[in-house]
């Protein structure tokens, strides 16, 4: 089932469009959902940029870190998650994939990759198969340093509790229910980016 009808989506993106302009395009009303998305995205961006500041040896692309952090959750409006003001039809789990489709329609493959690879610490084809997840088969793992940093930073913030910043221990505990591999990946990132 297609949750996003790309054929009917406007395609007026030129690579000069800012992250905020894209958000306002898909979230035109100043409502609780847009405010929550902006708040969460700024939290993730602030942490991702702090990683770049702490680790100049990584030569991270700060402009892209900001853009990707702001847009990693752009697909949430298409999902059914009323507790965070999302009244779409798709399962929340696929918000990254939906955001990736939006970004591809906008002509932004680089940001699309971040959208579809930030769930947990990434999803493998094995995860999708064994857990019967509603995603196309494939590996959705953050590969570039920027993809990894955005995924890492996102784990510290929840849209359900936007006022809180999780500790690394809380992040690890939240990932444990999905398996030890994700916890190990997070601790690897914590050692590298923390």
Q: Model-flagged regions — what are they?
A:
Residues 31, 35-38, 143, 176-180:
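Charge-dense, low-complexity intrinsically disordered segments
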Residues 16-20, 108, 168, 183:
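Alpha-helix initiation and N-capping motif
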Residues 42-46, 97, 187:
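Generic alpha-helical structural signal
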Residues 47-50, 155, 192:
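Alpha-helical scaffold segments in carbohydrate-active enzymes
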Residues 3-92:
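Acidic/His-rich, divalent-metal-binding segments that scaffold phosphate/diphosphate chemistry
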Residues 57-168:
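Divalent metal-dependent catalytic cores for phosphoryl transfer on phosphate-bearing substrates
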Residues 175-194:
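Charged phosphate-binding loop/patch that engages nucleotide di/tri-phosphates or the phosphate backbone
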Residues 22-26, 47, 98-99, 152, ...:
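A general alpha-helix detector
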């Amino acid at each position: 089932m297609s949750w996003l009808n790309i054929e009917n989506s406007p395609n007026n993106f030129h690579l000069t469009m800012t992250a905020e302009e894209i958000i306002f395009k898909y979230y035109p009303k100043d409502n609780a959902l847009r405010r929550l998305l902006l708040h969460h995205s700024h939290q993730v961006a602030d942490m991702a940029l702090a990683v770049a500041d702490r680790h100049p040896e990584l030569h991270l692309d700060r402009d892209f870190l900001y853009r990707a952090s702001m847009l990693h959750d752009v697909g949430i409006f298409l999902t059914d998650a009323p507790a965070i003001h999302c009244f779409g039809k798709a399962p929340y789990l696929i918000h990254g994939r939906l955001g990736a489709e939006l970004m591809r329609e906008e002509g932004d493959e680089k940001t699309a990759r971040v959208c579809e690879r930030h769930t947990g610490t990434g999803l493998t084809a094995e995860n999708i198969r064994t857990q019967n997840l509603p995603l196309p088969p494939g590996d959705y793992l953050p590969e570039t340093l920027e993809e990894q940093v955005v995924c890492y930073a996102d784990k510290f913030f929840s849209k359900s509790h936007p006022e809180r910043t999780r500790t690394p221990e809380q992040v690890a505990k939240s990932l444990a229910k999905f398996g030890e591999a994700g916890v190990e990946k997070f601790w690897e990132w914590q050692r590298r980016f923390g």
